[in-house]
């Protein structure tokens, strides 16, 4: 609502820089197209919807420009797949495909065309018309031009490169499984099994496969469904086996913090080791069986730690500001290889600032865990990652984006050749030359099998290599991306800096092409006499004497988030509506909302006010409300039901999946019968004839659990439940006493990608002197029909039991009843009582995937869902 951006930091500075730049591009687009406010979308003042490929693609392009991973994705598309149209770019391809389109556009027209396109989209309030006006091409023409560009760019790269399936044995098939990720392989020491992270069921789970055939042995862990495995670290993965092949260690988010899980492969039992760190990633089990190396993030850095299982204690073995990742042990268990952006800073304290350090390039390092000495293994201009130590020879395998493709490298660690008896120069070399790219190699103890994750066919799969130590050096030719870098540099740059201090003397008379005509940008058009381009751009009261920015205390300031309205019609309360306003501060610590209809006097209007204090783990809410409803009871009389009170609630989360809500509410219901009379002037007016009031306090507590996954039309997998207890202790004018417990339980089973079975059970019970009624039957907003009510014939078109004139418990039935629905085939309130139970069963399925009509009109229908229920 406020165009706010929250940045996660997990100890990796390059990742942090990328996220900041990426999200700020979104903020810029939201500000430029939508005025920086969700309200403009809600109120339809901004009718345009920026395509996801245009939005995410630009954020990726401006934050990363172009890199080997993006190049890998598009090379795979150009070679292996049907190239999608721009309208078909969604999901993962919205990011990389959109990034490629922006690279094509800026390469052909210049970066200035980015602003032209978004200005045109905003003027026309149509995304395709915006592109057409700025580029002279509609989406169909843009697709054709982009496809030609992809062919010219990537078809030359095919020559002399090996498709993954030709140079290795494929163990998984993401197309058959209809998933995207099969990553983070961990080969058991004996080479018989491989563990991996996979998203086959829409979650990230850990599976165990046969390392020879790829056949699944078992699903070891279900991720994203429980508190202990709330999140498996798939962005920085790391699975590792114990030396005896019996257990696996994995880092995961469990509730409030990250932990190490040690899982017995046979029994699936898990032991959790809690660590006082902000983040835990990439665990690796030592050959001695007692130590586990992992990446720990604390504050502003990530370091390598070792956890002693026997002592249940962790110690830090690197301690600096640099980003360290992917630790791996040597066969003796006395050295660890890891990835770092430290450059030449291997010993001693780093005295500089990280923003002056090149943290975008990574190399391989080793550290002796006994003396803490760090040695640099690689020193190239390329990025190296995912080291794995050979067990039978002094060699190291790792991946590198050498010449634009992520390949597997071998690096000898000693310069003595046992065959010749001579010393040789240590030289790393590629042992694969793949077409797309590979990552995350893992070795068996005898070094006879190496398994890695490779990208091909718009997805990741596991591949196996035999006898990797015997593989010869490969020649990896540079890609077109690398070759063209020398001529057309694609580095990230500050595109505004040249505009901050233009040399006016160099301008031709009357040329204002580089001027910025906008309020607040006057200084961009003035020459600066000194070399510090930024001095005049910084407000003088923002800096200290040493040049650092002055920290300022945060001040709470409320601004409007959204204004909306609603109109609804009920057979009980008639027509009603309300205008809703919501305010919050920039940090989201405080929230104020109120709504009103204000069509009559204060006494006869609907309104509410709510304040939420959301700064800490516990959320506090305070609400005051009033609803006034009028009913025509006969030709000369109206009934006014006025319901007003206050409510307080505390929401206490225990994890991502469950919370406890508790509080109390104070209710006052005023019943007034208004009779039509004539005043002294002969005018009609209403006069109160009968008045009585209900007043009660209702403490309540609810336990909520929800790990469901939503699809396009609702939950498709998981479990949801809400169990609540409400008590009326008898305080108030009517001494209303009851205790009600109810539970709503829902379970969803996902069958493949398209089918879901849903079961829902509802049960409720009320006891006490004034026990509540449960109304059973009907569905919300569909309440017509004849038949019987509680066994009594009732041929009326509508069931209005709670408004029957002879109903002695009128107010109690309206304001203190519970509804058990949906019960299709029955009318609203067809059964009522103090105990209720309801069971629903549904099968959800794709009804029409695609239907094109030619007569009487050319129309296309698609993605229409259906369900069968009982």
Model-derived features: positions:
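Blade-terminus and WD-like Trp-Asp/Gly-His loop motifs, strongest in beta-propeller folds
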Residues: 185-193, 239-247, 283-291, 327-335, ...
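A flexible loop/linker signature enriched in serine peptidases of the S9 family
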Residues: 72, 76, 178-180, 197-207, ...
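Outer-membrane beta-barrel translocator/channel fold
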Residues: 347, 435, 439, 459, ...
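Active-site-proximal alpha-helical
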Residues: 29, 50-70, 75-140
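Zinc-dependent metallopeptidase catalytic helix centered on the HExxH motif
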Residues: 2-69, 75, 115
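Outer-membrane beta-barrel initiation region
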Residues: 475, 480-617, 689-715, 813-824, ...
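Beta/coil-rich, acidic/histidine-enriched accessory regions frequently appended to metallopeptidases
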Residues: 89, 119, 123-230, 234-239, ...
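C-terminal outer-membrane beta-barrel translocator/porin domains of Gram-negative envelope proteins
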Residues: 629, 635-636, 681-870
